[in-house]
Amino acid sequence: MGDTIVEPAPLKPTSEPAPGPPGNNGGSLLSVITEGVGELSVIDPEVAQKACQEVLEKVKLLHGGVAISSRGTPLELVNGDGVDSEIRCLDDPPAQIREEEDEMGATVASGTAKGARRRRQNNSAKQSWLLRLFESKLFDISMAISYLYNSKEPGVQAYIGNRLFCFRNEDVDFYLPQLLNMYIHMDEDVGDAIKPYIVHRCRQSINFSLQCALLLGAYSSDMHISTQRHSRGTKLRKLILSDELKPAHRKRELPSLSPAPDTGLSPSKRTHQRSKSDATASISLSSNLKRTASNPKVENEDEELSSSTESIDNSFSSPVRLAPEREFIKSLMAIGKRLATLPTKEQKTQRLISELSLLNHKLPARVWLPTAGFDHHVVRVPHTQAVVLNSKDKAPYLIYVEVLECENFDTTSVPARIPENRIRSTRSVENLPECGITHEQRAGSFSTVPNYDNDDEAWSVDDIGELQVELPEVHTNSCDNISQFSVDSITSQESKEPVFIAAGDIRRRLSEQLAHTPTAFKRDPEDPSAVALKEPWQEKVRRIREGSPYGHLPNWRLLSVIVKCGDDLRQELLAFQVLKQLQSIWEQERVPLWIKPYKILVISADSGMIEPVVNAVSIHQVKKQSQLSLLDYFLQEHGSYTTEAFLSAQRNFVQSCAGYCLGCYLLQVKDRHNGNILLDAEGHIIHIDFGFILSSSPRNLGFETSAFKLTTEFVDVMGGLDGDMFNYYKMLMLQGLIAARKHMDKVVQIVEIMQQGSQLPCFHGSSTIRNLKERFHMSMTEEQLQLLVEQMVDGSMRSITTKLYDGFQYLTNGIM
């Protein structure tokens, strides 16, 4: 064998660990690379073998025949054989080397040989410790991304690329922007290490494929047009958009038209059988998103159609895997662009409702909302519930989307279309007395719309939206009260124990709940979103479900999304990642700070979707609608100072304010007017709109100079400067900063990798990363940090620029 290293045996698609301990011929060295990294069934054999060979060949070239043991220690291969008795760990120099070194005297040649051996020994030790780190439990996805970005060794990069297969999908998905940005803008070795994982996941998940295609397009847009056309990012995007990465199991199932054998699995787990509605849904809004047939005969004969040859169209032979979803997204973006041309909010709202009504004719279809965290099909958009959001120059809008949850998007048939007037047939059931009908029984039937009166016109489709605006109060039936008390009495009799109830406590709690029910906002033509956002989410879900022809289905869900056109959401995505990382750090360090990062979908360099924050309205809307100070609004919503509800809301306010103050300080978030700060029903504040972070500011003026926004109104809610909650706020700030700087590298690398090849304004200037690191104050003691926090809090609270900027926003945009 000479000095050759044993070739690793190819990986088999099995979940069993790599065979054999070191020294057992085939597979021994492969186990070095894969030992302790989890299930191997997801690792592509060629990828693993290539990575293994590159690592071992690199080690061999550097160290002249030195391999690595399964323990991660460097081994000297005597005569090329990996025999245990002849393997020596180089952590301690072998006796032969020590004897040779003693014999080497004053000659230059002998000195050179001695230095070479020492360098070889040191390099081997470094390789030993590196591999030990890679195989340890401490090696997480954050460290993998760091080594992939910083390492210049192709072998290490290949190993990390292979190791990606062993992390959880959701962990890798968090760093997808970083992985794709490295693929686009870094050298070929990094790209070659990343690509196998991306291709593998694209075959597994259509949603992952969509996000990769969108991000590759958005991050390639910063390149010169001639370079972009031939870049590796553009080529990978074209590969994803083609049907070459369609899951293999779908291709194999195409010829089969007969029903799958009943194996005891649920229908969604059996082999997918195309129905007519499924087939037609693969066509777009113009040619790919075509609605399912609305013929009642078709809708009632799904089982017949599932095995019919007429259910097959040419969608399988043409590259349309992502086409319906892309057309769906294009339609939503086109609506936003058309709305921006209209002068008034009222006109925009009317046009939005009309556009969405037309879009409903194309649904259900094989489309989904990428911001959701579960598989589903979009079946309906309740168009009358959509609202246009506040924006001076653009027209972002909020829509609610009805979906049917499914186990697997690729293999589940598209639901059949249910006509809007189908809801009329439920009237007769509604007239039945409710006594004796459980909540679950009502939810499982079509009878979900309250019987308001006997006027048939109340059920017309055109009037559903009006009925949904202001629902009359639903009075509890007397028989419901009887049933409830009967259950209570039976329970107490079975216990055979006397039940003592503090009547005073009951009266106090009931009076608090009745007196401090959350207030509703009035309709404002200039701000139509205020009423929609103020309505409690659960109430909105119930109301929309009652008016939906799909609401009776048990897997019905309601989602919401904000559609933005003309805005670059890549900075928003970067801010989301940093805040999400900070949230994880504080949870790990058990610091009770509260922030709520919301999901961002980058569609292009100037469009995207945002996950709305439910049960929350902006402080501007609060002040405009209530005409109260922030503290008085808290008292109105949650009760007096001593009530449990107020104290809980106050604590939530303090914990969230401290969390966002730290996040805004580290990211240098600007444009902090009251329209960009939300207040939820539980008292938390949530910052939104991170279009100006790090090196960028509105109009590049750098006007907001304070570390973060902390107004006297915020301090009043905390109980004033001398209050315990204000001291608690400063303590949380200190604890949060100490915890964050322990994990500084995890935060900094998110930003540093995205700076590669980027033209985003937040990266203008050469000192962006250096300034970010300085804000962690790594050289300060905890006592010095405490003094720093005191200074930042005091400076932000007294900042004249914050007051001037709020005044400027009020004068120019009417933001209170």
Swiss-Prot record:
Annotated region described as G-loop, given as residue ranges: 541-547
Membrane topology: Peripheral membrane protein
Entry-annotated residues carrying Phosphoserine: S258, S266, S275, S277, S284, S294, S428, S511
SUPFAM superfamilies reported for this sequence: Protein kinase-like (PK-like) (SSF56112)
Transmembrane segments: none
Activity regulation as described: Inhibited by wortmannin. Increased kinase activity upon interaction with NCS1/FREQ.
MF terms (GO), sorted A to Z: 1-phosphatidylinositol 4-kinase activity; 14-3-3 protein binding; ATP binding
PI3K/PI4K catalytic domain segment(s): 535-801
Residue span(s) of domain PIK helical: 29-242
Predominant location: membrane
Subunit structure: Interacts with ARF1 and ARF3 in the Golgi complex, but not with ARF4, ARF5 or ARF6. Interacts with NCS1/FREQ in a calcium-independent manner. Interacts with CALN1/CABP8 and CALN2/CABP7; in a calcium-dependent manner; this interaction competes with NCS1/FREQ binding. Interacts with ACBD3. Interacts with ARMH3, YWHAB, YWHAE, YWHAG, YWHAH, YWHAQ, YWHAZ and SFN. Interacts with GGA2 (via VHS domain); the interaction is important for PI4KB location at the Golgi apparatus membrane. Interacts with ATG9A.
Protein's gene: PI4KB
Family of the protein in this entry: Belongs to the PI3/PI4-kinase family. Type III PI4K subfamily.
Name of the protein in its database record: Phosphatidylinositol 4-kinase beta
Record's catalysed reaction(s): a 1,2-diacyl-sn-glycero-3-phospho-(1D-myo-inositol) + ATP = a 1,2-diacyl-sn-glycero-3-phospho-(1D-myo-inositol 4-phosphate) + ADP + H(+)
Required cofactor(s): Mg(2+); Mn(2+)
Domain of life per record: Eukaryota
Region (Activation loop): 687-711
